UniProtKB/Swiss-Prot annotation:
InterPro entries assigned to the protein according to its UniProt record, in alphabetical order: AAA+_ATPase, ABC_transporter-like_ATP-bd, ABC_transporter-like_CS, ABC_transpr_PhnC, MetN_ABC_transporter-like, P-loop_NTPase
E.C. designation(s): 7.3.2.2
Protein name as it appears in the record: Phosphonates import ATP-binding protein PhnC 2
Organism: Synechococcus sp. (strain JA-2-3B'a(2-13))
Region described as Disordered: 246-269
Residue numbers binding ATP: G35, P36, S37, G38, A39, G40, K41, S42
Gene it is expressed from: phnC2
């Protein structure tokens, strides 16, 4: 389980990116993190694995306070934190299998890493994961020949090869079409349930978050303003998170000037 207590982040400019964030994410739960740009969502993910150092507060992962670890201890702890990135972070010239196996580079010695020599058990697990994410036919295909959805599946398999306890997912569907986005979110959900993973997903697509997350946390100006189930994310709650907007509108409405311009154009033809 992940527990975050009173986490704050102040940048050297004085700007507060996070203000006393307190959360618990139990094993097996998929939590979606929503909010406007600049709300602190990406900063929160990066503070959890200490890619960004928090200013104050604590981050507990299965009984270990990550904020108190030294460099060596943090390196060990990060093995239990899988990251899935919006931009996939694949090595384009390497094959699917080589990219997946790169998730194990921190587990083997220098020479094994240098020559990319992995234990047979690790290779077998990589093949099993490729089959699980739907890429069993593409182990030797180069990453630069894959579609966006396939690349994201490689990223998921690579993260799972670490055998993580926590999965941090940053905008996994930002570059994907609606059908592929649903497939990726469904896959993440299934894997979290199968493996008992705590999952935090930073996502801008609110309807997609409501469809697949068991819990939604809304951030605004670095503070938690909503924490609850998807079905309670009403228009008034969305206004609190994002600011005033007509959340019931079905599409863009033309203002009176646009309508007048259209009418004038029709009249002249």
């Amino acid at each position: 389980m992940l527990r975050i207590d009173s986490l704050s982040k102040r940048y050297p400019t004085g700007d507060m990116a996070l203000k006393g964030v307190t959360l618990e994410v139990p094993d097996g739960q998929v939590m979606a993190l929503i909010g406007p740009s600049g709300a602190g969502k990406s900063t929160l993910l990066r503070c959890i694995n200490r890619l960004v150092e928090p200013t104050s507060g604590s981050i507990w992962l299965n009984g270990i306070d990550l904020t108190r670890l030294n460099t060596r201890e943090l390196r060990q702890a990060r093995r239990k934190i899988g990251m899935i990135f919006q931009e996939y972070a694949l090595v384009e010239r390497l094959t699917v299998m080589e990219n997946v196996l790169s998730g194990q580079l921190g587990y083997v010695n220098f020479w094994q890493s240098w020559f990319r020599k992995f234990p047979q058990a690790t290779i077998d697990e990589a093949f099993r994961l490729l089959d699980r994410v739907g890429l069993s036919d593409f182990p030797d295909k180069r990453a630069d020949a894959l579609s966006g959805g396939q690349r994201q599946r490689v990223g998921i398999a690579r993260a799972l090869l670490q055998n993580p306890e926590l999965l941090l997912v940053d905008e996994p569907t930002a570059s994907l079409d609606p059908k592929t986005s649903r497939q990726i979110m469904r896959l993440i959900n299934e894997l979290a349930s199968e493996r008992g993973l705590s999952v935090i997903i930073n996502i801008h697509d609110v309807p997609l978050a409501q469809m697949f997350a068991q819990r939604i946390v809304g951030l605004r100006f670095g503070e938690v303003v909503y924490d609850g189930p998807p079905n309670r994310l009403t228009p008034s709650v969305l206004n609190e998170i994002y600011g005033e907007e007509d959340w019931n509108a079905s599409g863009p409405a033309q203002d009176s000037e646009e309508n007048e311009a259209v009418s004038a154009g029709v009249a002249t033809h």
